[in-house]
């Protein structure tokens, strides 16, 4: 019988309630770990949230559901929220739903060509996501669009205190060679890349380059748009999951990513509060070492590169 993620979570929740009734602590402990931004030492919670597709909404009922997603993220100690003007209404939705506290760590992107066009787009994005104003946390160059132009603006803005950090992003591994050169020569504060059990090319050179250059790494598409979860949902959770304090496949996939020391924060996207509550549990408890990570890859891919 194939179980949906909702059904799997229901079984896990029932088991968790039983453990609590017996007085045993839940696996993972409940306190989200943090990792430092290498350039400054500022600590970031290790599970954040993306907004591609999920926050591009208009209806009141949809927004209330997303408000609960944010509540689950913050309740667990998460703070990182990533968006882009490419994502439709997502930036505006985030700005509308955020309350006065806790203070999030907000990231968005510039996704246009030209200095003046980039400045106008970034100002609009910052106002949409954080109407309260003040220094914006992280501005990234989306998919390296006109990056040489925007790097100059972002450095000026960082020096002026308009933004706190700047970075680069791309959604395909085909851009990793260029990103590696930018990391080495331009020294961004952040990169955002795809990295997962199924997409591991970043391990070859880009992640080591980020570690050497003291660049923080945000990981997009940790579930490969859900395909990795669909591939495993029919399988029972393996007994070894308990060795890294996991109660779901989603947690295993996220902890596999966090097992790489160069990774700062995966940013799974969801519009389902139950899925967010599940994902954030990967932010606490034991992480897999390198041997355990190889075991996970072998389990899920048959050992294929």
Where on the chain are the PLM-derived regions?
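N-terminal binding-site loop/beta-alpha segment at the start of enzyme catalytic domains
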Residues: 2-104
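Conserved, mostly hydrophobic/aromatic
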Residues: 37, 49, 81, 94, ...
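Acidic (Asp/Glu)-rich catalytic clusters
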Residues: 38-41, 94-102, 125-132, 156-158, ...
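Short, well-ordered coil/turn segments that N-cap beta-strands
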Residues: 44-46, 77-79, 102-104, 134-137, ...
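Acidic-and-aromatic substrate-binding clefts and catalytic sites of carbohydrate-active enzymes
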Residues: 56-58, 84-92, 112-118, 142-148, ...
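Short, acidic/polar
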Residues: 60-73, 115-130, 174-181
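Active-site groove signature of glycoside hydrolases
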Residues: 130-146
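Beta/alpha (TIM)-barrel catalytic core signal, keyed to glycine-rich beta->alpha loops juxtaposed to Asp/Glu
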Residues: 142-305
